[in-house]
Amino acid sequence: SLVINRSDAITLANAISGSGSFTQAGAGTTTLTGSSSYTGSTTINAGVLSVAVLTNGGSSSNVGAATSDAANLVLNGGTLKYTGAAVSTDRLFSVGTNGGTLDASGTGAVNFTNTGSMGFNGQSGIRTLTLTGTNTGDNTLAAVIGDNGGATALTKSGTGTWVLTGNNSNSGI
């Protein structure tokens, strides 16, 4: 497992490989630029994980090559910031009890196309998913946003545009 626990900004240009996981734990910003093939989960507990390449699950990208299962991309208090060109990915994600943020600030829209259910880490309590960014294209979230034993609130901030296409059932709005 690789854990980044820094309060400043750092760029990791090398590819990460193996079966381990990656965790963004510090309040700083970590930018991953390597085409990584690690197959463990990516967890963002604090700060910002900035990437320019998101592929479908199972393919190498800045967040590894884990499957598209929601347990393999976890937002739990931190931000996944997309800074690349227009892209579609079938990756689902989970939101923990500390909430999480998707930031679409690339040169093109980011489209999360998987229509499965968003995952949850921690079964009770209120969690907030924040959608933000500066990209004014139609950034899309097709995943179903539910509650799963708690309430899931949804917040939109920033100048970017987000389109929700899932059959959402969350009660925390």
Over which residues does each language-model region extend?
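Beta-strand repeat architectures
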Residues: S1-T11, S17-T31, T39-N111, T115-T140, ...
